[in-house]
């Protein structure tokens, strides 16, 4: 199977930088594209991204730039940006003349906005001709950057594209599996952050490990409910992929997860309204909640965990008996 001659990663946060580090294990021509000139220079000269990854050393041959004009020259472009920036970022790529020859790997987790939709559906209107796949896995950014063992699922409607990307990213310590169910992986990647908030709240309440295991099972059921409503889950076994079960378990069990941390700090807060107003860190699950509520309403779905978290995080959106006091 052919190797990509070069790989671009678009997004210089913790996850984007970690994915660039991962890609550089197998490819000698990897460039990280980001907006912050100072961080780009730091990566070039010091091989660190202290703001997002501390003092973790990045591969010596990893390049970094703020010049999007050259991104069209890369065979594989990995998109690793927050979901709220997805539309604008893809439109920006279009202005820099990427063509149907550029393969896209979407590592963004969440839903497109205005209107609420799967990222794959939004791409059909923005970049309909590019080979596209989705990357979801149980991956804490700092562990990826440290080259610790991990895995991920690569999904594409074109299974040959998924296999090629998997081949280019896999190694002895990073394993991949492929799937054609792009819907289930996208849904799982978005919802797991909301379930992690619930896990953090339960941790603050000292609910115990039995409750957390029960949450995992219930969360998988809700992932399946929304996935089927959006056209996924043609095979029940798709729920067992690393990008579904693995990512859900990792996110819900780790305080290294921004969303679990957010839920925990919300749970121990004595003034929840003030906490929610003043909390500045990005918690993707908080961002995704209103979008998921749109889909629940549109398809008339019963997803009680999502409703409970909404009652905690978006006061008065849904009157739920299980809401926090």
From Swiss-Prot:
Q: Does the keyword Cell inner membrane apply?
A: no
Q: In which pathway does it act?
A: Membrane lipid metabolism; glycerophospholipid metabolism
Give residues annotated as binding NADPH. Answer: 14-15, 35, 109, 141, 258, 282, 284
Its keywords, alphabetically, are: Cytoplasm, Lipid biosynthesis, Lipid metabolism, NAD, NADP, Nucleotide-binding, Oxidoreductase, Phospholipid biosynthesis, Phospholipid metabolism
Catalysed transformations (reactions): sn-glycerol 3-phosphate + NAD(+) = dihydroxyacetone phosphate + NADH + H(+); sn-glycerol 3-phosphate + NADP(+) = dihydroxyacetone phosphate + NADPH + H(+)
Q: Write down the EC number.
A: 1.1.1.94
The entry's active site is 192
Q: Which PANTHER family match?
A: GLYCEROL-3-PHOSPHATE DEHYDROGENASE, GLYCEROL-3-PHOSPHATE DEHYDROGENASE [NAD(+)] 2, CHLOROPLASTIC
Protein's UniProt name: Glycerol-3-phosphate dehydrogenase [NAD(P)+]
């Amino acid at each position: 199977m052919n190797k990509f001659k070069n790989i671009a990663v678009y997004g210089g946060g913790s996850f984007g930088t970690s994915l660039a580090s991962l890609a550089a294990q197998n490819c000698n021509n990897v460039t990280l594209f980001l907006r912050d000139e100072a961080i780009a220079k730091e990566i070039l000269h010091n091989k660190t991204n202290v703001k997002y990854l501390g003092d973790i050393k990045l591969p010596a041959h990893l390049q970094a730039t703020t010049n999007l004009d050259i991104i069209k020259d890369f065979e594989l472009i990995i998109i690793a940006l927050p979901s709220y920036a997805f539309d604008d970022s893809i439109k920006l790529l279009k202005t820099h003349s990427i063509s149907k020859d550029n393969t896209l790997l979407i590592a963004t987790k969440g839903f497109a906005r205005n209107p609420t939709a799967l990222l794959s559906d939004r791409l059909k209107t923005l970049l309909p001709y590019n080979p596209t796949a989705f990357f979801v896995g149980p991956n804490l950014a700092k562990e990826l950057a440290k080259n610790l063992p991990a895995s991920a699922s690569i999904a594409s409607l074109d299974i040959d594209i998924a296999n090629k990307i998997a081949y280019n990213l896999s190694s002895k310590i990073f394993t991949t599996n492929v799937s054609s169910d792009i819907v289930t992986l996208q849904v799982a990647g978005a919802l797991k952050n909301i379930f992690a908030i619930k896990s953090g709240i339960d941790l603050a309440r000292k609910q115990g490990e039995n409750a957390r295991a029960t949450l995992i099972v219930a969360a998988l059921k809700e992932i399946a409910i929304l996935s089927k409503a959006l056209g996924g889950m043609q095979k029940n076994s798709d729920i067992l992929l690393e990008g579904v079960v693995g990512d859900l378990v990792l996110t819900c069990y780790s305080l290294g997860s921004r969303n679990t941390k957010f839920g925990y700090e919300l749970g121990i807060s004595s003034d929840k309204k003030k906490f929610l107003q003043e909390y500045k860190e990005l918690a993707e699950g908080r961002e995704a909640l209103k979008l998921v509520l749109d889909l629940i309403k549109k398809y008339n779905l019963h997803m009680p965990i999502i409703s409970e978290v909404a009652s905690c995080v978006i006061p008065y959106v849904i009157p739920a008996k299980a809401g926090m006091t």
